[in-house]
Regions:
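Membrane-proximal, non-transmembrane interface segments of integral membrane proteins
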Residues: 1-83
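Soluble C-terminal extramembrane regulatory/interaction domains of multi-pass membrane proteins
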Residues: 65-182
Length: 182
């Protein structure tokens, strides 16, 4: 009967596995902080937190239209932050997005989730949820515009390059209709 207590020691070892997983998870979460820029490291952490919250809300909210909007917001938010991580000089361009639009959108979606989960019908709840429904298209559009704005400088540079190339081709007699005529 003495051997029986020893097999019980094995389950206590398995009880120690979750902390080992936590340590591995923490190491994984700390890995992105190797950018060397504390502001970019904080941005990456905020991205991970925001996207995780959007996924949680998306799973919790049953409305298919809101769910599609959350998918769009998640995708665009990831692209916005990835663009700034790749080009840290653009960080100032998303300050309002990160400090107001993103957290306020998450706050509103959390309120929508709580109201929907309450399962209560009433003028206040229905009216508020209706306003959130109506507003989500505008939020998606605003997030898309924020992403587009990050590419404005590149678009201008490329447009300038195209203009110069067209002018050079024309000067060399290689542009436009002349190519087919020779």
């Amino acid at each position: 009967e003495m051997p029986d207590p020893q097999p019980q020691a094995a389950p206590s070892a398995s009880e120690e596995e979750p902390p080992a997983q936590d340590a591995a998870q923490e190491a994984q979460e700390e890995a992105p902080s190797s950018t060397g820029d504390p502001k970019i490291d904080a941005l990456i952490q905020e991205k991970d937190r925001a996207l995780q919250e959007m996924r949680r809300l998306n799973d919790a909210i049953e409305d298919e239209i809101i769910s599609r909007r959350i998918d769009q917001l998640e995708d665009t938010t990831g692209k916005i932050i990835d663009q700034v991580v790749a080009h840290p000089e653009k960080l100032s361009q998303i300050r309002t997005f990160m400090n107001y639009y993103l957290p306020t959108t998450l706050k509103i979606l959390n309120a929508y989730d709580r109201m929907g989960a309450a399962g209560v019908e009433g003028a206040n709840i229905d009216g508020t949820m209706g306003r959130i429904d109506a507003m989500m298209d505008k939020v998606v559009e605003a997030f898309d515009k924020q992403l587009d704005a990050l590419f404005a400088d590149e678009a201008l540079d490329i447009s300038t390059d195209i203009t110069v190339l067209e002018q050079m081709l024309a000067q060399e007699g290689l542009g436009g209709m002349q190519m087919g005529q020779s």
